[in-house]
């Protein structure tokens, strides 16, 4: 993505996008694209507590990031971005979305959190790119050509 989304557009970013940005691995192209997306959309980004948890557990297990850095990262997420908590409304919405779209439990929570915060774009490598939800949220795969 070469231009930033307008600041009125809220963008929810799924876990794998964050992980590509944080971990330099064998797929440098995806890492670079993820970093660019996060930079370009920084003012419009929204995350959920689930995404923060998933990022942290993967950084601990796969990248062996020290706990002190994980603590700093958690604080940074909460300081820099709106964080959607997985409350009753989000969980009930996730259940409804699972029924409508045949999603996994965890993917439905991601989608419900994105809908709940009013995001218009959900960046995800895992969910169905192009899917429109309730007429205002579109799933985009930032790595698709």
For each predicted feature, which ranges?
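Short acidic, glycine/proline-enriched helix-loop-strand junctions
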Residues: 73-76, 81-87, 91-92, 100, ...
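Substrate-recognition element of Asp-dependent hydrolases with the DxDx(T/V) motif
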Residues: 45-50, 124
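Active-site neighborhoods of divalent-metal-dependent phosphate/nucleic-acid chemistry enzymes
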Residues: 3, 82-122
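Active-site-proximal, substrate-binding regions of enzyme catalytic domains
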Residues: 54-82
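Acidic, PIN/NYN-like endoribonuclease modules and their adjacent C-terminal/linker elements
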Residues: 1-6, 111-145
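Short, well-structured N-terminal submotif of metal-dependent ribonuclease cores
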Residues: 1-47, 62-72
């Amino acid at each position: 993505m070469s231009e930033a989304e307008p600041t009125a557009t809220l963008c929810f970013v799924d876990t794998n996008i964050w992980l590509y940005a944080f971990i330099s691995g064998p797929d440098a192209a995806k890492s670079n694209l993820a970093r660019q997306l996060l930079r370009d959309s920084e003012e419009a980004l929204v995350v959920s507590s689930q995404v923060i948890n998933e990022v942290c557990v993967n950084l601990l297990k796969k990248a062996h990031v020290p706990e002190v850095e994980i603590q700093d990262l958690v604080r940074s997420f909460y300081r820099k971005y709106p964080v959607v908590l997985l409350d009753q409304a989000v969980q009930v919405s996730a259940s409804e979305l699972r029924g409508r779209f045949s999603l996994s439990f965890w993917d439905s929570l991601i989608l419900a959190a994105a809908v709940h915060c009013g995001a218009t774009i959900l960046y995800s490598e895992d969910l169905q790119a192009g899917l429109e939800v309730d007429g205002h949220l579109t799933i985009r795969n930032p790595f698709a050509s």
